[in-house]
């Protein structure tokens, strides 16, 4: 499969192990694309690693910031604008997203518009979990408890809930 990883802000942190998994098992995957966005260049996580990954021949790294500062020469705009700019086959891609809810919602929709099916898009519903056993209800997302049932879900399992604000 091709692999597309899309992170927004601190959402890159939980995706980092997946990035290293793909890099350490490159022979098991075809095209590998990382799409990452942050508010500003100063808020980019793992800047040194982003630079190293971007220099690799076996992956594509596309980075965007919402607001450019002096000296920034990269892309400006929301990370979802990067969808479609990397080499991957929408019919064969597995996609992993983590970031703010709105980014995941619009990111998934952009990927769907490119032909990726909802059962191949995985979202990491990182929530502030307290008890980790589903007792307190703090991480309840509709009928789902993120701590017990996730935090990673196929998009087709949560797409209706992710559309609702404040769920």
PLM region descriptions:
Residues 1-130:
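FNR/FR-type flavoprotein reductase catalytic core
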Residues 142-167:
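Non-heme iron-sulfur electron-transfer modules
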Residues 102-103, 126-151:
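Local cysteine-cluster metal-coordination motifs and their immediate loop/turn environment
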Residues 44, 133, 157:
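Short acidic, gly/pro-rich beta-turn/loop elements at beta-sheet edges
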